[in-house]
Amino acid sequence: MAASPHTLSSRLLTGCVGGCVWYLERRTIQDSPHKFLHLLRNVNKQWITFQHFNFLKRMYVTQLNRSHNQQVRPKPEPVASPFLEKTSSGQAKAEIYEMRPLSPPSLSLSRKPNEKELIELEPASVIEDSIDVGKERKEEKRWKEMKLQVYDLPGILARLSKIKLTALVVSTTAAGFALAPGPFDWPCFLLTSVGTGLASCAANSINQFFEVPFDSNMNRTKNRPLVRGQISPLLAVSFATCCAVPGVAILTLGVNPLTGALGLFNIFLYTCCYTPLKRISIANTWVGAVVGAIPPVMGWTAATGSLDAGAFLLGGILYSWQFPHFNALSWGLREGYSRGGYCMMSVTHPGLCRRVALRHCLALLVLSAAAPVLDITTWTFPIMALPINAYISYLGFRFYVDADRRSSRRLFFCSLWHLPLLLLLMLTCKRPRGGGDAGPPPS
């Protein structure tokens, strides 16, 4: 029988030494399977798997012992900003400067300040002055009511009611009254003129009341009374009410209900439709043209009490005249309308603005030729009106082709004298009525 290794070693070494060697060999042989299994377990822990490479920052991980020690790839050093200064340890340290106090140092009244203290006082005074200037400018931009003088009130109310525009409205109403068939009634004519003027003042005042925040952004309208604070909004609304109520009452009771209804409808159309529509759509120009075409119709209905073909012809002439007039005006004010937030053809549709102006210049030729057909004027009127209608059509064509400020100004100034001259020619060439010149019937 073969002897085991530990028996051989124990035979060679006798005594205590042999016993110790025998015990160690036996212990080693018994513990070897357990150590082998323990070694396999530790080796499995040290293997690198796919999960070690699945980090978002792609860190290279190496396990040294049982605890995981991660070695991260060093990041590049950031570029030093002009506000940071590198220290000896390699870290960035923010450099903070102490600000000088704005308040001047207190000086005793018993001694005079020296030159150094005066130099320190100067920057603080400059800063305080700049702050005061900023506050003053901010206060200037705020709306505040100015002190109203009694002798300034008529001029302020005249500008609030747009007295020149009101005079134009009254003149077109008077032309419609004079062109209507029938005898000329002076009391009715005066009542119609006064009522129409009051209605126009009311509509213009309410229009300015609604457009205060927008008029302040335009050079053309920034000096209006409400924008400058020369009059309070309450006083402006009260003035508009005091004009609208008696104006509509005079037209309704003093003239006829039809004329009063047209006056009330025109106030509503101008204040509640045209005014808000100016910031919504370019259709405001067509609505505003209808507003301007109603006054001559009111003059016709005041004289006749009915809506005839002549009333619509006068309204059509005023309707077409307003497009070259206003489109040429708005062309030179495109920057102001855009800054004020108004939606105008000259700003959003410049090509359409020029085409519409030319189209209605040519329409004036057709409407003038229709006057004798409707038995309003004689045939001499379209012949006499041909030169001025042809001239404004030519300027409308130049405005359409050139599309510049010079051509728009020429068209605008031509429209200012074109309408009064055209209405004067209509009055001159008015067809006489046979019954008006006839004598009393024989008894």
UniProtKB/Swiss-Prot annotation:
It is found in: Mitochondrion membrane. InterPro entries: Protohaem_IX_farnesylTrfase, Protohaem_IX_farnesylTrfase_mt, UbiA_prenyltransferase, UbiA_prenylTrfase_CS, UbiA_sf. Pfam families: UbiA (PF01040). It catalyses: heme b + (2E,6E)-farnesyl diphosphate + H2O = Fe(II)-heme o + diphosphate. It is an enzyme of class 2 (transferase). The keyword ATP-binding does not apply. It is a multi-pass membrane protein. Keywords: Heme biosynthesis, Lipid metabolism, Membrane, Mitochondrion, Transferase, Transit peptide, Transmembrane, Transmembrane helix. One of its GO terms (cellular component) is mitochondrial membrane. The chain crosses the membrane at residues 174-194, 235-255, 257-277, 280-300, 309-329, 364-384, 411-431. PROSITE patterns: UBIA. One of its GO terms (molecular function) is protoheme IX farnesyltransferase activity. One of its GO terms (biological process) is lipid metabolic process. CDD domains: PT_UbiA_Cox10. Belongs to the UbiA prenyltransferase family. Converts protoheme IX and farnesyl diphosphate to heme O. This is Protoheme IX farnesyltransferase, mitochondrial. It comes from Pongo abelii. The gene is COX10.
